[in-house]
Design a protein with these regions (language model features):
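Active-site neighborhood of phospho(di)ester-bond hydrolases with catalytic His/Asp-centered motifs
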Residues: 1, 19-24, 45-48, 60-65, ...
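Short coil/turn segments at beta-strand junctions that form active-site/ligand-binding loops
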Residues: 16, 57-58
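A short, sequence-level motif marking secondary-structure junctions
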Residues: 49-52, 113
Length: 113
């Protein structure tokens, strides 16, 4: 969830491209619920609420919603969640993640704050 559009403005001010999907706490109905992108030979799906069934047309699902970090492979699809900075759940620490893609490989590093 972005929640406040000023947060999005701050992210954009960092000078890097920003892709947003709408979360359950976001009021901007213009933001898409799902975005598919290809990077480094991999197909990614960005969506706030993770699907119950692994999609068959992507390699990686990047999601939020649970506020719990996740790095789990299901049905050949890698599910990644960086956790949450402001309101982590289930005893998880506040966290962010770094995602690097090179030669069709993913390097995922969770960073506790």
């Amino acid at each position: 969830d972005v929640c406040a559009e000023r947060i999005l403005d701050e992210l954009r001010a960092a000078g890097r491209p920003v892709t947003v999907v709408r979360g359950n706490c976001d009021s901007n109905s213009e933001w898409p619920l799902v975005v598919d992108v290809a990077r480094g030979g991999l197909r990614f799906r960005l969506e706030h609420i993770p699907p119950d069934v692994p999609p068959d047309d992507v390699d990686v699902v990047l999601h939020g919603h649970t506020h719990v970090p996740r790095n789990e492979k299901r049905g050949g699809v890698l599910f990644l969640n960086p956790g949450c900075v402001t309101r982590p759940n289930q005893g998880a620490p506040a966290s962010v993640a770094w995602l690097e893609i090179a030669n069709g490989k993913i390097k995922w590093r969770l960073v506790d704050l």
